[in-house]
Amino acid sequence: MVNTLRVILWDEEIGRLAWDEHRRLSYFTYNPESLKKGIDVSPLQAPVRGIRAMTPVWGEDAKMYQKLPAFLADSLPDAWGNQLFELWRIQNHIPNADITPLDKLSFIGKRGMGALEFLPEVAKTDKAEKIDVKSLADLAERIFFERENAHIMPEESITMQSLLTVGTSAGGRQPKAIIAINKTTGEIRSDQVAGLQDYDYYILKFGDTKYSSAEIEMTYYEMAIKSGIDMMPFCLPRTMAFGVLMQSSGK
């Protein structure tokens, strides 16, 4: 169980997030050096000026915040990420009672969709591993439908690790992954290393062999473009295991 996390913004520690076992709540305290810079990450709930900046920001009891301060709760994994996290917890024989929201943030680590990062990391990797998208899509679909009953075969352990790496931070209910694609060779890697040369970053939304969700999403994208709405580029590559790609700026 993780009891304390460093909260990082733009490579600097802005504060610490800790878990109070007695109150069963987390609380955030600012780093004094960060306060001097005046960067307001949450001006309404946790302003960096005035007396409130010197007091802990306690987590919220409402279910949607999962015992975290509201401005940190948005970094938690969403429905699909939670599904992967739960499978990881079961595989590692960790009792559910031992899990706190800090464990989930530690699991996200540096892979969150926003600017905030949480250290130390669980399942840390510093390499942009090559990815077999077809195997990834097949496993993602099975986990999505079988949930915690999904059984991961020994030969699938590498694919499962890849899915945990690229899939837990992407929000939403449907299976998806954040990947990097080489513009010249088409080689696909995980998004773990920012600024890979000759690579573009994408959100890969896995389709469903039972329901044409990717095609439907692509249709709505095309309608939005024709209506004059400015959107990130989408594409529907047939080689991507029934998935749809949305370009990302990377992290």
Regions found by a protein language model. Give the residues of each.
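Phosphate/dinucleotide-binding and metal-coordinating scaffold of catalytic cores
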Residues: 1-251
